[in-house]
Amino acid sequence: MDMENLTWLHGKPTASGILKANPEDFVVVEDLGFEPDGEGEHLLVRIRKNGCNTQFVADYLARFAKLHPRLVSYAGLKDRHAVTEQWFCLHLPGKEAPDLATFELEGCEVLEAVRHKRKLRIGSLKGNAFTLVLRHITDRQDVEQRLQQIAAQGVPNYFGSQRFGRGGNNLVQARLWANNEIRVKERSKRSFYLSASRSAMFNLISSHRLAQQLSTTVLEGDALQLSGRGSWFVAQADELATLQQRVTAGELNITAPLPGDSELGTHGEALAFEQACLAEQTELLSLIKHERVEGSRRAVLLKPQNMISNWWDDVTLELSFWLPAGSFATSVVREIMNQDRADDTDIIE
């Protein structure tokens, strides 16, 4: 998916700059959203890593603890080209914990280990805290104005380009699969391609809403989500005025679909809008239905929390903020500046 074709909330930036000139310019700290139990058959291990991807570290931990790889889990994938603090979970029923003081892997440091009663699963995170350094910024004034706009109105909650694979290959392969031009047997590839398909359709609908100034305008039949919650409800015609006030106040979010094998969830005017946006995606929709992927919805807009900016000089900005799990830091940066160097790597979940 070409991110350049997606609508900006605050207009295309005039400033350009570089993100991730080095791994230390992109720091991610996982926020579990709960305190480990301190007891149980699972061991949660928090590791700071630099230059290692998530699965590589998980596999290494499994070998170190003499466990089957399936007994080591994590809540989300993180990029290797960054400094990340991430939790891993070792399933140790009736077993002593390995001596992590002897754990050695280049680029990795064990920060803590604590027992827990439940397995850490994909999506278990509450969110992630980011600290980014943006370098060689060409227009400080424009960036400062955009930071104020983002703090007040947020950014489009787009899936970043990394969701679609390098050069958008996951989406390319998904379309070939949908058209029966290739067979996809490997489970992980099937998952990547289906995820890319659904994410692309979410981005497409969200972009159309922004282009028509509908990102915060409630349509009859819209699916609305309480801020910070995953559940949603449908806007009825006789409630539009009240619901519009709640959206404007930030209590409710307008959502767009991650299509699945069920209905989109909207009705009336909103359903017609979404169906029109997806009119040319029939092959991908058929693939998703055939594979029986469960549908869901996601807020169209994203408001970074606890956003703090610190200018080191006129061309270098340190920016920190918190995002809920599944949201992309690069979607925040996209509204701030154009990147001089394309980088398809980022936090994935």
UniProtKB/Swiss-Prot annotation:
Residues 154-302 form the TRUD domain. InterPro entries: PsdUridine_synth_cat_dom_sf, PsdUridine_synth_TruD, PsdUridine_synth_TruD_CS, PsdUridine_synth_TruD_insert, TruD_catalytic, TruD_insert_sf, TruD_pseudoU_synthase. The active site is at D79 (nucleophile). This is tRNA pseudouridine synthase D. It is an enzyme of class 5 (isomerase). GO terms for cellular component: cytosol. Responsible for synthesis of pseudouridine from uracil-13 in transfer RNAs. One of its GO terms (biological process) is tRNA pseudouridine synthesis. Belongs to the pseudouridine synthase TruD family. It catalyses: uridine(13) in tRNA = pseudouridine(13) in tRNA. The keyword Cell wall biogenesis/degradation does not apply. Its EC number is 5.4.99.27. One of its GO terms (molecular function) is RNA binding. Disulfide bonds: none annotated. NCBIfam families: PRK00984.1-4, tRNA_TruD_broad. Keywords: Isomerase, tRNA processing. Substrate binds at F26, N128, F328. Coiled coil: none annotated. It comes from Yersinia pseudotuberculosis serotype IB (strain PB1/+).
